[in-house]
């Protein structure tokens, strides 16, 4: 499957005879595998008599690293969830840091139990497993630091109008382009393992399970994007951001994060499990908590199942 897909990833026509010879199988076997692509991966294969087969459009396949990278990276053809896989490996004693990237996810998930749409070869589904030895102090603001790193990686590709929504959504033009999900095992007050899940909409053009305005790097750039280039930028930004966070805490990133905060000074509604809180967004504190002006008094909010939305049109 993987070899055939790589052969077709250039978007050009390939005859069944050519593909069969390269794979060492019959033309009918090639046909069956292509049917499997369409059935199992939702990919469109064009068939033209006398020319052969090609994918509806080229695919940007993740290539093996040309260098060592900041940590080991395992690229998987298909996985239920990169977060779930990293948590399994951490529980089995894998040595952190390490990362897992899936070409597709069959059970991708986001914050608050939401499904994360994960078509094959379209986006980045990436999870970094790390060990945190600084306890709660190191965990404070970590998701915001990761969001900032993701925003800067997207900016590195020339994307404009990139902004952040507390706590960790990345938006372009007011539409979601990336999200972060942190899950941990162990004692958060002492030593624990953290799975830092990152999903970035890269080349996706159609989605059926996204219940909010969204966009992709391809949509805003006007053409297909090399996912390898974005992956390299992401890992570089992540390595720098997490190192700074470990050494200096969230305070070192606070000003830069607020400079990208789209709702700074806006009237917002913060939804909690118990109620809705309306106030003006003042920014974030040195722990990454959201600062709101509520009924003339400043309040701070962090952790738990919190959701923020605009409540004004200014």
Q: For the regions a protein language model found, what residue spans apply to each?
A:
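A short, compositionally biased micro-patch
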Residues: 48, 119, 165, 284-285
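N-terminal lobe of the biotin/lipoate ligase/transferase fold
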Residues: 1-156
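Conserved active-site carboxylates
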Residues: 169
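Long, positively charged amphipathic alpha-helical accessory segments at protein N-termini or as interdomain linkers
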Residues: 1-26, 32-33, 134-162, 172-314
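A short coil-to-beta-strand element that immediately follows conserved catalytic motifs
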Residues: 98, 160-165
